[in-house]
Each structure stands twice: as C-alpha cells, then as structure tokens.
From Swiss-Prot:
Keywords on record: Cell cycle, Cell division, GTP-binding, Magnesium, Metal-binding, Nucleotide-binding, Septation
Protein family (similarity comment): Belongs to the TRAFAC class TrmE-Era-EngA-EngB-Septin-like GTPase superfamily. EngB GTPase family.
Descriptive protein name: Probable GTP-binding protein EngB
GTP-binding in keyword set: yes
Length: 199
C-alpha cells in the first residue's frame, strides 16, 4: 500500500485558491496548527525526507502546497493555522480562503488533521473539525509526537480525544510518531479509503 504514497511528488504551490489544480479527481487535505508536525507527517507518510519542507519558523508558510500521487490523486498541504505571531490580516485572509476552499472544492475526499498529542483539540482544531463535519468530509485525526509522552500518557490522551469527537460523524483518531513510524500503516489504510484505492 505504501507504493501509492512513496511516489508522491511536488505538484504546485499557490498563495490563493485561484492557483489550485483543476477541481477534479481525489484530493485529501493535511491541516494542523503550526508546529504540530504536519510536514514531518507528510514526509513520513510518503517515505521521503524532503518532500514537504519543514519550516523553522511556525506559521511561515502561507501557501497551499499540492503533492501528486498520480494524475487523479493529490495531497493538499494547507497553511499552518493558529500561530500567535502571524499578523492579524494574514489570519483573516487564511480564514476566508479556507472557508471558500472547504465549500467550493468538490474533489475533496478526506482530511487528515494533525495535532500535537500534548496539545490536542485547540479552538482552531475544533474549527477545522466543524468545517469538515459540515461538508460530511471523512476525517482522520493523527496525534503526532506520541514518542514525546510515556505510553500511558499518550494512551490517556488518545481516549480523551476519542471521547470528545463522538459527536462528529466520519471522524477517527490515532496516535502517530514520525520518529518511530508509529501509526503509519493505519494512516496508509485510512488514506486508501479516501483515495478510492479500496472499496
């Protein structure tokens, strides 16, 4: 199953929705708060070290970045959200662009919401969940950096988040570690359903 993701390659980067690829095929978004480990998760998912650039300055990347799996399937890396040092006018633009993106892209097939296991379900995460839920978009929450916590603490956070998302349909959660490759096979399996690789 990993071969689909290992062949991912950079497609394009755009500052606004006008530059997005044609609204067709299968598109799965990766979204998360700045510094949640989103770029590293994408690199781990694709078994590549430098596909998604890891910024040393959280909130720096304000472009939508698309990675192509094949001519019909794409990963969309959304700008990191919720970082305090981002100017207010950029936050406002981000909110407007994301609202339009979620409501206008008919090709959306799934979402991966990336959350630091030590700081899950912050207000911006909740907003992303609501957007996904409003358009009935299947969603996988990955609690990254699980290696930073002891096993019991990580497990407790997992069950706490699982309980809090019961009100949402089509949402699942898992622990994930880019360092130890924890949860990688489960994420591949979930993405296979998003991309139509399995019935």
């Amino acid at each position: 199953m990993c071969k689909h993701y290992h062949q991912a390659k950079f497609l394009l980067s755009c500052p606004s929705l006008k530059g997005c690829p044609p609204d067709q095929g299968y598109e799965v978004i990766f979204a998360g708060r700045s510094n949640a480990g989103k770029s590293r998760a994408i690199n781990t998912l694709t078994l590549q070290n430098k596909l998604a650039k890891v910024s040393r300055t959280p909130g720096r990347t304000q472009h939508l970045v698309f990675f192509e799996l094949d001519k019909d399937r794409r990963l969309a890396d959304l700008p990191g959200y919720g970082y305090a040092k981002v100017p207010e006018h950029i936050k406002v633009k981000w909110y407007k662009d994301m609202n339009e993106y979620f409501n206008q892209r008919d090709c959306l097939r799934g979402a991966v919401l990336v959350m630091d296991v030590r700081h899950p379900l912050k207000p911006f995460d909740q907003m992303m969940l609501d957007w996904c839920n409003n358009i009935h978009l299947p969603t996988q929450i990955i609690l990254t950096k699980s290696d930073k916590l002891k096993k019991i603490a990580a497990s407790n956070t997992y069950f706490k988040v699982l309980d809090q998302i019961k009100k949402y349909s089509y949402v699942d959660v898992q622990l994930f570690s880019s360092l130890k490759k924890q949860g990688l096979k489960k994420l591949w399996t979930r993405l296979d359903t998003f991309f139509g690789y399995v019935d």
